């Protein structure tokens, strides 16, 4: 019940003001909301989530961005910082742990590669529904 009340209090405060700061027991801002901007910090003061209009960043414990969304661009990184998924409008790439592209979708073209980088499937001019079916395993 206490959590629900705190959440309701936070929502009420956000609706009634443009700027909101939620602090931890040491007085450090943990959640910061200002207009369309939202920032949350971890116990070391590093920003974990960052939302600013169309931009969203989710960081790991080392401060590296794992998820990055900016408009139509989406990047998802692995623990080494290499982009695993990349989406930009019509282009989608998925990479393996060595950075090799496994799936590549660009407009109406689709390539699927094996672990050695050899092209297994190549479609050109296929319907979008086929692309979705092939990408989901």
Q: What are the language-model segments listed below?
A:
Residues 2-5, 13-37, 41-46, 52-54, ...:
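Long terminal segments
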């Amino acid at each position: 019940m206490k959590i629900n009340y705190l959440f309701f209090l936070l929502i009420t405060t956000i609706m009634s003001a443009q700027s909101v700061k939620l602090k931890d027991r040491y007085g450090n801002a943990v959640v910061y909301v200002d207009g369309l901007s939202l920032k949350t910090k971890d116990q070391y003061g590093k920003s974990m989530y960052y939302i600013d209009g169309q931009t969203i960043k989710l960081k790991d414990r080392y401060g590296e961005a794992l998820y990055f969304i900016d408009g139509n661009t989406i990047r998802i990184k692995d623990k080494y910082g290499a982009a695993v998924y990349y989406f930009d409008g019509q282009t989608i790439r998925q990479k393996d742990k060595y950075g090799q592209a496994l799936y590549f979708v660009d407009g109406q073209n689709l390539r699927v590669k094996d672990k050695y980088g050899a092209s297994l499937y190549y479609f050109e001019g296929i319907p979008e529904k086929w692309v979705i079916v092939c990408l989901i395993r």
